[in-house]
Swiss-Prot record:
The gene is pxpA. It catalyses: 5-oxo-L-proline + ATP + 2 H2O = L-glutamate + ADP + phosphate + H(+). It comes from Bacillus cereus (strain AH187). Belongs to the LamB/PxpA family. Catalyzes the cleavage of 5-oxoproline to form L-glutamate coupled to the hydrolysis of ATP to ADP and inorganic phosphate. Forms a complex composed of PxpA, PxpB and PxpC. It comes from the Bacteria. Its EC number is 3.5.2.9. Keywords: ATP-binding, Hydrolase, Nucleotide-binding. This is 5-oxoprolinase subunit A. PANTHER family: 5-OXOPROLINASE SUBUNIT A, UNCHARACTERIZED PROTEIN YBGL-RELATED. GO terms for biological process: carbohydrate metabolic process. InterPro entries: Glyco_hydro/deAcase_b/a-brl (IPR011330), LamB/YcsF/PxpA-like (IPR005501).
Length: 253
C-alpha cells in the first residue's frame, strides 16, 4: 500500500490576530509545522497548538522563518548563513521546550516561506538549516522541496533524514521549483485541479509544470495550506480521495 504524509502549517495566529483553521484541519493531517514566533505565532499560540496536536496524535515539527512578522516571512532577506543558523536554532529550541513541557517529542523541521525557497536553491542557506538541526537534535527529520539538490546535499552532509515535499495547491516551474507567489499562476485555486495534481505526484511520480512539461517528483509528504477560504473543505477532500485510492496517510518515521 502506498503511504504518504499530509502536513500543514499551523499556529500562525498572533496575539489578537487569528489566522488559519487549526482546529478544523487537525483531524485530516498526519504532521504539522508550528510557527515559532519569527514570521507568525507567539508563545501562547505555540503552546496551544502543540497541546492540540498531541490530542490528535499528529507529528509535531518546527516551522522556522525569517524575523519578518509584517511580511509573514515571505520576503527574501540578505543575511549571512551564520545568522540563518542562529534563527533556526533559536526557533527549534523554543518549540522544543513547549513540546517537552507537554510530554511530547518533536518530529521534524520545515523552514517557512522565503527561508524555505531560498534554501531550496542556495546550498549555504540549506547547510545552515541542516547544521542547526544536527546540533540541536540530529534525529529530527528535515522537510524540504522534492528534488532540491541543496536540501539533499545538506541533509547528506549532516546525516539527517530528508523528507521530500510536494505541494497540493502550488504550481511548479520546469526546473521543479515552485512558481513565485508574486506571479498570478502561483496558486491552484480549483480543487479538482489540485486533487488531480496530488494524485499524479503520489501515484505516478510527476507533476505538470506551468509550461505543460512533466517534472519528476518523488514526494514523501504533501503540504496543505490551512489559511485559505476553502482550506478545511480541501483538506477533507484530499483525505477522502487518498482513502478511496487506497493511499495510507501516516507521518514519516
Amino acid at each position: 500500500m502506498t503511504t504518504i504524509d499530509l502536513n500543514c502549517d499551523l499556529g500562525e495566529s498572533f496575539g489578537a490576530y487569528k489566522m488559519g483553521n487549526d482546529d478544523e484541519i487537525l483531524p485530516f493531517v498526519s504532521s504539522i509545522n508550528v510557527a515559532c514566533g519569527f514570521h507568525a505565532g507567539d508563545p501562547s499560540v505555540m503552546r496551544q497548538t502543540v497541546e492540540k496536536a498531541m490530542q490528535h496524535n499528529v507529528a509535531i515539527g518546527a516551522h522556522p522563518g525569517f524575523p519578518d512578522l509584517i511580511g509573514f516571512g515571505r520576503r527574501n532577506m540578505n543575511v549571512p548563513a551564520s545568522e540563518v543558523y542562529d534563527y533556526v536554532l533559536y526557533q527549534i529550541g523554543a518549540l522544543d521546550g513547549f513540546v517537552k513541557a507537554a510530554g511530547g517529542k518533536m518530529h521534524h523541521v520545515k523552514p517557512h516561506g522565503a527561508l524555505y525557497n531560498m534554501a531550496a536553491t542556495n546550498p549555504e542557506i540549506a547547510d545552515a538549516i541542516a547544521k542547526a538541526i544536527y546540533h540541536i537534535n540530529p534525529s529530527l527529520l528535515l522537510y524540504g522541496l522534492a528534488n532540491s539538490e541543496a536540501f539533499i546535499q545538506a541533509a547528506e552532509k549532516y546525516n539527517i533524514t530528508l523528507i521530500q515535499e510536494a505541494f497540493a495547491d502550488r504550481t511548479y516551474k520546469q526546473d521543479g521549483t515552485l512558481t513565485s507567489r508574486t506571479e498570478e499562476n502561483a496558486l491552484i485555486k480549483n480543487e479538482e485541479e489540485a486533487i488531480k495534481q496530488v494524485l499524479q505526484m503520489v501515484k505516478e511520480g510527476y507533476v505538470n509544470s506551468v509550461n505543460g512539461e512533466k517534472v519528476a517528483v518523488q514526494a514523501q509528504t504533501i503540504c496543505l495550506h490551512g489559511d485559505g477560504e476553502k482550506a478545511v473543505q480541501f483538506a477533507k477532500r484530499i483525505y477522502r480521495t487518498f482513502e478511496h485510492n487506497g493511499i495510507s496517510i501516516c507521518a514519516p518515521k
